[in-house]
A protein has these predicted regions:
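Generic helix N-cap/helix-start motif at coil->alpha-helix transitions
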Residues: 25-30
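Hydrophobic/aromatic side-chain positions at a characteristic register within alpha-helices
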Residues: 31, 38-39
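Mid-length scaffold segments of soluble, non-membrane domains
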Residues: 142-182
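An ectodomain-focused feature that recognizes extracytoplasmic/extracellular
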Residues: 94-156
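C-terminal motif of bacterial Sec signal peptides marking the signal peptidase cleavage site
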Residues: 15-18
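Internal interaction segment
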Residues: 180-200, 208-266
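Short, charge-rich amphipathic alpha-helical segments embedded
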Residues: 44-79
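Alpha-helical linker/edge segments of TPR/alpha-solenoid repeat scaffolds
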Residues: 71-101, 112-113
C-alpha cells in the first residue's frame, strides 16, 4: 500500500512538473515578443504582450517574474522619455513667458500675496483714479481674467460683453460678486470676469469693440485700441504661463513615476 502511494505521489509530481513546464513554454513566445517590442521602442505593444501572459498563463510563474521585471523597464524607459520631452517643452514655455512678462507690469506684495499678477502698466490703479476702465490680467499660474472698475451708479454686473460692429459678441461671466469701494468723491464697483485666449482673438479680429457691463442694468465701459493691445499681450502671457504650470505638474508626476519604478527595480 505504501509503495502504491509512493508511486502515485511520484507520478502526480511528474505530471505537475510537466504541466508547469508546458505552461512556461506556452507563455515564453509572449515574453519574447514583449522583449522585441521593447527593443523596438514599441512600449504599448510590449505592455500588451506582458498583460497577455498574466491573463492567459497565470501559473507560468517563472515567465511572469521575467515579464514583471521587463514591465518595470518599459515603464521606466517610457517615463524617462516623456520627462525629456516635457523638460524641453517646459524650457520653451518658460522662455516665452519670461519674454512676454517683460512687457507688462508685475504686481505683487510679498507681505500678503503668494501669487503675483501681470497687466499693462497703463492699467495701474494709481494711473486710473476715479476712472472706469477694464484691466486684462493674468496671475503667475496663467489664470486669465479681466477686471472691470466701474465708477458710478450700481450695476451689480454678472456679465462683461464685447460687441463687434457687425453685432456679433462674446460674453464673459463674473467669477464672484462685485466688490464695492466708496470714497468722498464717489463709488467704484470692481468685478472680475473669467477670460480665455479666444476673447482676445475675437477682439483682435475687429477694428472697434464696444464693452458693456450687464447686471441690474447695462452700462458701457471705455475700451480703446490700447486696451485691445493690452488684452492681446496678457492673453499671450496667460497661455505661456498656463502651459508652464501644466508642464511643471506633468514633470513632477513623471519624476514620481521614475522614482517609483527605480525603487521597484532594485
Amino acid at each position: 500500500m505504501k509503495i502504491r502511494h509512493f508511486i502515485l505521489t511520484l507520478a502526480t509530481g511528474f505530471t505537475l512538473a510537466n504541466c508547469a513546464e508546458d505552461v512556461e513554454k506556452l507563455a515564453k513566445p509572449y515574453l519574447d515578443r514583449a522583449q522585441q517590442s521593447y527593443a523596438n521602442n514599441q512600449y504599448a505593444l510590449a505592455k500588451l504582450q506582458i498583460d497577455s501572459i498574466k491573463q492567459l498563463y497565470p501559473k507560468a510563474f517563472d515567465t511572469r517574474t521575467q515579464a514583471q521585471a521587463l514591465l518595470i523597464e518599459v515603464e521606466l524607459t517610457e517615463a524617462n522619455t516623456s520627462k525629456c520631452y516635457t523638460d524641453s517643452l517646459l524650457a520653451i514655455a518658460q522662455e516665452k513667458a519670461t519674454t512676454l512678462a517683460a512687457t507688462l507690469y508685475f504686481d505683487k506684495d510679498v507681505r500678503y500675496q503668494d501669487i503675483g499678477t501681470y497687466y499693462a502698466s497703463r492699467h495701474r490703479t494709481e494711473k486710473n483714479v476715479d476712472k472706469s476702465y477694464l484691466r486684462p490680467q493674468t496671475d503667475e499660474r496663467g489664470v486669465f481674467t479681466i477686471t472691470a472698475f466701474y465708477r458710478g451708479r450700481a450695476i451689480g454686473a454678472h456679465t462683461l460683453r464685447f460687441t463687434a460692429p457687425d453685432g456679433s459678441y462674446v460674453d464673459l461671466p463674473a467669477t464672484a460678486e462685485p466688490y464695492i469701494m466708496s470714497d468722498a468723491t464717489g463709488r467704484t464697483e470692481r468685478t472680475d470676469f473669467a477670460a480665455t485666449p479666444e476673447v482676445a482673438h475675437f477682439v483682435g479680429a475687429h477694428t472697434t469693440i464696444t464693452a458693456t457691463l450687464i447686471g441690474e442694468r447695462k452700462a458701457q465701459i471705455p475700451f480703446a485700441k490700447t486696451d485691445a493691445q493690452a488684452l492681446a499681450q496678457v492673453a499671450d502671457l496667460a497661455s505661456a504661463l498656463k502651459a508652464s504650470t501644466e508642464l511643471q505638474a506633468a514633470q513632477q508626476e513623471l519624476t514620481r513615476r521614475i522614482t517609483f519604478y527605480e525603487q521597484r527595480r532594485k
